[in-house]
C-alpha cells in the first residue's frame, strides 16, 4: 500500500491500513512530513523517484490535492488508484481511460466522514477487495 502525502487524511489512512495489517509506504514532497512518517513506523520513498516505484504497489491512496501524477506516471501504476484528494486531484481521471476499474473515486469520503472514520472505512473496503474481490488471494 502506498499513501501519497502525509497530511491529516493521509496520516489517518496510513494508520487505518497499518492497523488492518497492511504493509504501508508513504511518499511526500515535503521532507519534514516524510521524516514524521518514518518516525511513526512507515516505510518512506522519495517522491522524486515515483516513476521507478509506482508499478510496485497494488493500491495507491492519493491525498495530495494537486496534479502530482502525469499521464506517464499513471501508465506506471499497475494496481488500484484511490483518489481521496479534493480538486484539482492527484491525477486526471482521463489518464485512466480504458482502465476505469483501476480508478476509485473516494473524494467525498474524507468530507462525508471524519478523517479517522473515513480512513477506517477505506481500509475496510480495501481489505474486502483484497480478500473477496481477488478470489481470496
Label the model's feature ranges.
Residues 16-24, 78, 101:
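Conserved S-adenosyl-L-methionine
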Residues 1-17:
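Glycine-rich adenosine-cofactor-binding loop
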Residues 49-69:
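Rossmann-like NAD(P)-binding element
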Residues 66-81:
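Rossmann-fold NAD(P) dinucleotide-binding segment
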Residues 87-137:
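Adenosine-phosphate binding glycine-rich loop
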Amino acid at each position: 500500500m502506498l499513501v501519497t502525502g502525509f497530511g491529516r487524511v493521509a496520516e489517518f489512512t496510513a494508520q487505518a491500513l497499518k492497523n488492518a495489517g497492511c504493509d504501508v509506504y508513504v511518499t511526500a514532497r515535503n521532507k519534514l512530513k516524510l521524516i514524521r512518517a518514518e518516525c511513526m513506523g512507515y516505510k518512506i520513498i522519495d517522491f522524486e523517484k515515483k516513476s521507478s516505484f509506482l508499478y510496485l504497489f497494488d493500491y495507491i491512496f492519493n491525498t495530495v490535492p494537486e496534479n502530482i501524477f502525469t499521464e506517464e506516471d499513471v501508465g506506471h501504476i499497475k494496481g488500484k488508484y484511490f483518489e481521496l484528494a479534493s480538486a484539482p486531484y492527484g491525477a486526471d481521471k482521463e489518464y485512466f481511460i480504458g482502465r476505469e476499474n483501476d480508478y476509485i473515486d473516494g473524494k467525498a469520503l474524507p468530507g462525508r466522514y471524519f478523517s479517522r472514520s473515513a480512513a477506517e472505512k477505506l481500509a475496510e473496503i480495501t481489505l474486502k477487495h483484497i480478500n473477496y474481490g481477488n478470489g481470496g488471494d
